[in-house]
Curated annotation (Swiss-Prot):
Residues 38-280 form the Peptidase S1 domain. Pfam families: Trypsin. Glycans are attached at N82. The active site is at H78, D127, S232. It comes from Mus musculus. One of its GO terms (biological process) is proteolysis. PANTHER family: SERINE PROTEASE 27, TRANSMEMBRANE PROTEASE SERINE. This is Serine protease 27.
Length: 328
């Protein structure tokens, strides 16, 4: 009988398609369909920052975040001081205007929140959390993940990056309705310079703040432009090898856009291992031209690049070919 090999041949295109779709999903990160880069506190365009999400409590926006996988959002730990009732939280994806989310937007309930256990309070290290959604979202032109960097990616001082959010435009004002997503280009500031800035003009009732090793500064010494209240947990992204990679998570600052007080972010690369422990299937963006590897739980080396799904499909094809030879 030759019928088994016919069934196997019918499975072949399905296996090839599965591998191709996996590779396409991985390539989706950091590649929005819309490009329009203007410097300085401007309205974003629809689909321009498709990983930006609004984290809401009882239907009200209180923090930003970034989609990093179909069921996971990266944000700040200080956004979740109390998670005893997880049912009050939801995530809004694919929206440009908070008050008028539009047809491309999607509300998804929160399943659980995992804060970094090393986090000890405002302005401390490890101010990162992972929000798991109730179910996976389908990637569209308006809902796409941002790439996360592995430790090989260095964000140099002076590098121009972007911060986005629905936070207040200043310490006194609230973003006017319909609350359009804002974008701002900010340069990276090296840690020694940032510490010097935060040591200037220190008021007597303020505790001196230190930029820790897992923190990253971005902004302007003269102030005037910065993230503000309501932006917390949102992404600081930089263009690396033609992909948008998240360098930091909005964490803290003194006021908003004050002189000598640039924004402080948590370095994503500093918490690469913790993120990978919770989401082992998540792949990280390495430097161009390098083949990044990670060890699985058994200590075996495995590829961490976009070729993995293709290699898996290739292996299945070889196995299927061997099966056909045995059958015929």
């Amino acid at each position: 009988m030759r019928q088994p090999h016919i069934a196997a041949l019918l499975l072949l295109p399905l296996l090839l398609r599965s591998g191709t779709e996996g590779a396409r999903t991985l390539r989706a990160c950091g590649h929005p369909k819309m490009f329009n880069r203007m410097v300085g506190g401007e309205n974003a365009l629809e689909g321009e920052w498709p990983w930006q999400v609004s984290i809401q409590r009882n239907g009200i926006h209180f923090c930003g975040g970034s989609l990093i996988a179909p069921t996971w959002v990266l944000t700040a730990a200080h956004c979740f001081s109390n998670t005893s009732d997880i049912s009050i939280y939801q995530v809004l994806l694919g929206a440009l205007k908070l008050q008028q989310p539009g047809p491309h937007a999607l509300y998804v309930p929160v399943k659980q929140v995992k804060s970094n256990p090393q986090y000890q309070g405002m302005a401390s290290s490890a101010d990162v959390a992972l929000v798991e959604l109730q179910g996976p979202v389908t990637f569209t032109n308006y809902i796409l993940p941002v790439c996360l960097p592995d430790p090989s990616v260095i964000f140099e001082s002076g590098m121009n990056c972007w911060v986005t959010g629905w936070g207040s435009p200043s310490e006194q004002d609230r973003l006017p309705n319909p609350r359009v997503l804002q974008k701002l280009a900010v340069p990276i500031i090296d840690t020694p310079k940032c510490n010097l800035l935060y040591n200037k003009d220190v008021e007597s009732d303020f505790q001196l703040k230190t930029i820790k090793d897992d923190m990253l500064c971005a902004g302007f010494a003269e102030g005037k432009k910065d993230a503000c209240k309501g932006d917390s947990g949102g992404p600081l992204v930089c263009l690396v090898d033609q992909s948008w990679v998240q360098a930091g998570v909005i964490s803290w600052g003194e006021g908003c856009a004050r002189r000598n007080r640039p924004g402080v972010y948590i370095r994503v690369t500093s918490h690469h291992k913790w993120i990978h422990q919770i989401i082992p299937e998540l792949q990280f963006q390495g430097r161009a031209g390098t083949q990044q590897q990670q060890k699985d739980s058994q200590g075996q080396q495995r590829l961490a690049g976009n070729s993995a799904p293709c290699l898996a499909a290739h292996a299945m094809v070889l196995a299927l070919g061997a099966l056909l030879l045995r059958i015929v």
